Amino acid sequence: MIALIQRVTRADVRVGGRTTGEIGAGLLALVCAERGDTEAAADKLLAKLLGYRVFSDAAGKMNLPVSNIDGEGRAGGLLLVSQFTLAADTNSGLRPSFTPAAPPDEGARLFDYFVAAARARHPIVETGEFGADMQVSLVNDGPVTFWLQVRP
């Protein structure tokens, strides 16, 4: 499973002109299930995402997770957006292959599982809509962007 995470000062996702998810300071995570991924992989990726220390502490070092973005216990937002293109095979030719991505029904099931698990563990979780044509707006803080990937 893959998550491309970006530290943001704000982010939102819109579908068909309506906002489906919006956060202030926190993390925007573009999330992709790959063929063979399991709930265990989703749990492992979520634990990494929630614990990843990308927010600055008082000394200015990236040392704080999304659950404590200011060093005083304030949780940041988490905006989860499904994006199967993260699994693209770009090794040959000029057109990406999406064979490595989980089939749509399995991808939807794992994304829903990931979102439910995130909501059980973090107070501020917003989402896009799986499989929809979405418009994502963000202000990347830093910029700070990381590729997280776990194998089943």
From Swiss-Prot:
Disulfide bonds: none annotated. The keyword Ubl conjugation does not apply. Keywords: Cytoplasm, Hydrolase, RNA-binding, tRNA-binding. Its EC number is 3.1.1.96. A motif (Gly-cisPro motif, important for rejection of L-amino acids) lies at residues 142-143. The keyword RNA-binding applies. One of its GO terms (cellular component) is cytoplasm. It is found in: Cytoplasm. It catalyses: glycyl-tRNA(Ala) + H2O = tRNA(Ala) + glycine + H(+); a D-aminoacyl-tRNA + H2O = a tRNA + a D-alpha-amino acid + H(+). Transmembrane segments: none annotated. Homodimer. This is D-aminoacyl-tRNA deacylase. It comes from Burkholderia cenocepacia (strain HI2424).
